[in-house]
Amino acid sequence: MENLNIVTLTGAGISAESGIPTFRGKDGLWNKFKPEELATPEAFFRNPKLVWEWYDWKRQLIAKAQPNEGHKILTKMEEEFPNFYLITQNVDGLHQRAGSKKVIELHGNIWKVRCVECGNERYEYTTPLPEIPPKCEKCGGLLRPGVVWFGESLPVDALSRAYELSREAHVFIVVGTSGVVYPAAELPFVAKENGAQVIEVNPEETPITKIADMHFKEKASTGLKKVYDYLREKYGSKG
């Protein structure tokens, strides 16, 4: 169905199956820190070396991870349905590594670095980083991770596009997100108010469950397989 708009919102639950921890709780080396103590502009400018050591550790974990079946099913959906879009709260880049092309990153990307002085932004895939904290090759300024920290606004372009897609969605799929981090958590409600069918995939109930037309109470990979089969059966595909 050429004009069927399918929008999917993903959270940490889909990456958990790739072995990426949520970076809360008992993560050994860093468990004495809470993410909200390190992932802030204040923490970064107070101690950029400490914050970068944490991100360097996270980047190394993510580099070893592989996209899982859930990521791959979303890639298949994009290939089959022309108006399929993916909005993610994740910063790990696993959707792109799985082959997804139409990805809107609400919280940035851990593989991006941005200079706090001149604003130059680029991808940096080296792990571990040769220098901590890394410096800008253009001006020598301090580089920061290209992610959204606590207390920062989401990128305006990504957020406005996410709202636009949510308003236009016929089917809105929510996968592995807690439904408590705003403004992302509002998107399924925006879709619902505009007539979309909301499908949730999450082993737990969330604030989104009450508005979901279908809830697959299971992990991302198995739940998404069922959603994929349902969409193909109901709407067919271009092929």
UniProtKB/Swiss-Prot annotation:
GO terms for cellular component: cytoplasm. It comes from Aquifex aeolicus (strain VF5). It comes from the Bacteria. This is NAD-dependent protein deacylase. Signal peptide: none annotated. Keywords: Cytoplasm, Metal-binding, NAD, Transferase, Zinc. The keyword Transit peptide does not apply. It is found in: Cytoplasm. Zn(2+) binds at C115, C118, C136, C139.
